Amino acid sequence: MPLSTSLLGKTSTYKDSYDATLLFKIPRINNRNALGINSNNLPFYGVDIWNTYELSCINKKGKPWVGVGTFYIPTDSENIVESKSFKLYLNSFNNFVVESVEELERIILQDLSNVTHAKVTGRIFPINTKIAFGVPSGKNIDALDIVCNNYGPPDNSLVEYEEVLVEEEINSNLLKSNCLVTGQPDWGSIVIKYKGKKLKHDSFLKYLISFRNYHEFAEQCAERIFTDIKNAIKPDFLSLYIVYTRRGGIDICPYRSTDKSYSLPSDKRLIRQ
């Protein structure tokens, strides 16, 4: 279905009964083709991590339950889920009676797997689970004194490097782009870990800032950045993790890595989540 038929950017009515058809799929292939990414031979592994903070249902006695969920959509899924449709879908459980939290978890995982055409994993937690705030790992480059005059479209010529091999981890909290349809801002903290030619931190920060007025979905921004770095420095290893702030009760955190046996970063929330 074309994106114009989705509920994104439109006035919506919240349904008071569970409805899996609310989930709206967006094929990954269109954006990947534009980036020169072969969907049958992806240059990365990883997941899109969806954290959901507005999750509720009713038990058999009519008593409401609330919780939070974390769901992992693999990068080799055929589709992603449009975020507003996911919000409306989750809220359709508000008056839905379930036997247990495990049943709710099973239903959601099955529905997400069906719409993405991949095996989605995840867990649902009670809200009294204690979670500490973390900080992005690596060296922060935001304090660099640079002059910026490009806020979009992203300029991959700014991904400059030095002819010296390094292994380093850098991060920035200055990433911002905008929803492709609504124009709402997506604020993100990004962590780049790589082994290869040394990125010039000042020009790379300018590159990240060049997304500021750009309109693209979060997952697609992540793959654009990953591709631009990979094409520029041809690293022996590269991983990218973006933690986006919460919008509509959901935050999306894409992770991409050249390492098939990757380990996910710490799941500690950052202060802006």
Swiss-Prot record:
Coiled coil: none
Active site: 179 (thioimide intermediate), 186 (proton donor)
Domain of life: Bacteria
Chain residues that bind substrate: 81-83, 218-219
Family: Belongs to the GTP cyclohydrolase I family. QueF type 2 subfamily.
NCBIfam families listed in its UniProt record: QueF
Name under which the protein is recorded: NADPH-dependent 7-cyano-7-deazaguanine reductase
Listed EC numbers: 1.7.1.13
Annotated localization: Cytoplasm
Gene Ontology CC: cytoplasm
